[in-house]
């Protein structure tokens, strides 16, 4: 019983640390056109919110289309595996947290667009620019997921949308 309570407490603390204000620092994708400036999956995150014991995760972000920042909130629904969330945005999306530190959260996502094309993505959220060590770790993770390191885009410096 004690192990179960410790596990539940740890799970709750991890999700509590995940909630709050976060900004997209970098994005990687195997279809790099989707994350270039003006790309439909180049999102500028603002916050994560867990609801219903984190069975629902709300992600609030901006997309910048034609020079206009549009605020969007999506809700991801936790799937039976207890790790993956599913939502709709520019097609069907499945995403999960793959790395976590006090400074950054890294999510792996797969998007299947309306033309039935699959895109693998990594999003790293944080509060400031990545260190050299963090960049290297992100590049290694991208390669592990089948995303060329050359397809990483640092987006924090291009985020001109409102806070």
UniProtKB/Swiss-Prot annotation:
A GO BP entry: sensory perception of smell
InterPro entries: Calycin, Lipocalin, Lipocln_cytosolic_FA-bd_dom, OBP-like
Intrachain S-S bonds: 50-54, 69-161
Any one annotated GO CC term: extracellular region
GO MF assignments: odorant binding; small molecule binding
UniProt subcellular location: Secreted
Tissue: Expressed in nasal mucosa (at protein level). Specifically detected in septal and lateral nasal glands.
Keyword Secreted: yes
Keywords: Disulfide bond, Olfaction, Secreted, Sensory transduction, Signal, Transport
Post-translational modification: The N-terminus may be blocked.
The keyword Disulfide bond belongs to this UniProt entry's keyword annotation: yes
Known partners and oligomeric status: May form a heterodimer with OBP1B.
Role this protein plays: Binds the chemical odorant 2-isobutyl-3-methoxypyrazine.
Protein name: Odorant-binding protein 1a
Organism: Mus musculus (Mouse)
